[in-house]
Regions:
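Extracytosolic ligand-binding ectodomains
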Residues: 2-22, 26-462
Length: 462
């Protein structure tokens, strides 16, 4: 059942369940609870994948370890790791495990762990930070800026289209996000909605990036944080460096409407499909809060008589639940969905719900390469960058910052985990002359990860 969450009073009471975590998402993964077993292993008996690199020689083990997963399973995995080892390996993790509470839950400061994550590196990052702080009394977390940008773009495109129609909204996505026109950001979103409703050209400049969409609906530029945990007594992570990257067409590319009909005195329908429960709950909840702020701003001002009906559904960090929740939003007639959080849910939801129902999907954190390759008729966008880029960033950090020459990977057994592991491995070996000894898959929700840790640390020879 779709829930109307348009009331500020309800939003204020929602609370924040951790602002620093997330999972790719973050890259891939709302697919957590329905990941499959490897071909030759069931339950916790995981085996290395056939796509892994050289197993290396002997039992000396790798210099570094890449772990790709989500916070809930990460707790047990890292407990097992620290109980089995002296913690001497350099460990690199992506955004999916960026949860400041993890060291306390694991019972170890995790000082040997470094992370990478898409950063809030947009031109209007500070304006968003202030809005989030004012609304919820806490600092924003990972992928919250991307969530705000997704919802804001959906509202602006709808205002420009003048109707709650997926195809009409799709045609306006690049027109309102890519150059040129009136520059709009979180700080003047209300004025931007009014301009879009009046048929004016606008250029949304986001909190997470410039939000220029390329021909695939991916961000044309992105920034990445290199970050560390602050220890067992903290609930935070610290970004120690931020690096910016641009694609071949930093101003964006792809089909776009030449003009927008606009329209006044109407209701914009917005769907929000993110995880309130399941493996990504701790990071999904702040993302939901961020996605609600654009609607709050518009409803308080009613520019050109525009109001926003924001409706939320919980993916439960599960592909089947995410598809069912998406169907609920489709039945409610939403033309645009901010979601989902992970590629494990985003891919099936897009294929089974958004694309056939001609609904625009714009994920704030689904980063798997498979999203780019969807046959989507241009209905699927995202404000988070592809793991094509994050895999390169991770390989560079592992080689140049952490100084590792031999590495094993441990990855959650879904599109996000497998594709990011393979992308990292390819770049690490081809561009940085490293050796990937083995790539080992693991399932979400296991009671022990000792066997997969042993396999990774022995280079797959155990």
């Amino acid at each position: 059942m779709v829930r109307d969450i348009d009331r500020r009073k309800f939003l204020k009471g929602a609370g924040i369940a951790g602002v620093a975590g997330l999972a790719g998402c973050i890259g891939g993964g709302d697919g957590g609870s329905e990941s499959t077993e490897t071909e030759s292993g069931g339950g916790s008996e995981m085996t290395e994948t056939e796509s892994g690199g050289s197993t290396g020689g002997g039992m000396s083990g790798p210099d570094g370890l890449v772990v790709i997963g989500y916070p809930e399973s990460g707790i047990q995995l890292f407990r097992d790791y620290y109980s089995q080892t002296d913690g001497s390996q350099s460990i690199l993790i992506p955004d999916g495990l960026r949860d400041g509470a993890l060291p306390a839950q694991v019972g170890n400061p995790m000082e040997n762990v470094t992370g990478t994550a898409p950063a809030a590196g947009g031109p209007n990052q500070e304006a968003f930070n202030e809005l989030f702080q004012e609304e919820y009394g806490s600092a924003p977390g990972v992928f919250t800026s991307q969530s705000f940008d997704s919802a804001a773009i959906g509202i602006l495109a709808n205002a420009a289209a003048g109707e709650n129609s997926g195809p009409a909204v799709k045609d306006q996505m690049r027109r309102i996000a890519n150059p040129g026109g009136m520059e709009v950001g979180p700080q003047n979103l209300v004025e931007g909605v009014e301009a879009a409703a009046n048929g004016e050209d606008i250029n949304y400049q986001g909190a997470s990036s410039a939000t220029n969409f390329d021909q695939n609906g991916d961000p044309a530029s992105a920034a990445y944080d290199i970050w560390e945990f602050e220890g067992v007594d903290s609930q935070s992570t610290t970004a120690v460096e931020t690096q910016s990257y641009s694609g071949e067409n930093p101003d964006g590319a792809g089909p776009s409407a030449d003009s927008g009909p606009g329209g006044s005195d109407r209701e914009v329908s917005l769907g929000i499909l993110l995880p309130e429960t399941g493996d990504l709950a701790s990071t999904g909840q702040p993302m939901i809060q961020a996605a609600q702020i654009p609607g709050i701003l518009v409803n308080e001002a009613n520019p050109a008589g525009i109001s926003v009906n924001a409706q939320i559904e919980d993916t439960q960090t599960s592909p089947s639940a995410g598809v069912a929740a998406g169907q609920s939003l489709a039945s409610a007639g939403v033309p645009f969905i901010c979601g989902t959080a992970s590629s494990g849910v985003n891919v099936p939801m897009s294929q089974q719900v958004a694309i056939p129902n001609e609904i625009v999907g714009c994920s704030p954190s689904s980063t798997a390469l498979s999203v780019t390759n969807l046959e989507d008729n241009d209905f699927i966008f995202r404000t988070a960058p592809s793991d094509q880029l994050q895999g390169r960033v991770m390989a560079q950090v592992m080689s140049e910052r952490l100084g590792a020459s031999t590495v094993s990977t441990l990855y959650v057994n879904n599109d996000y985990g497998q594709q990011l592991s393979e992308r990292f491995s390819s770049v690490f070996e081809d561009s940085f002359d490293g050796e990937v000894m083995t790539q080992v898959a693991f399932n979400i929700g296991e009671s022990s990860y000792s066997s997969v840790i042993e396999s990774a640390l022995s280079g797959g020879s155990s």
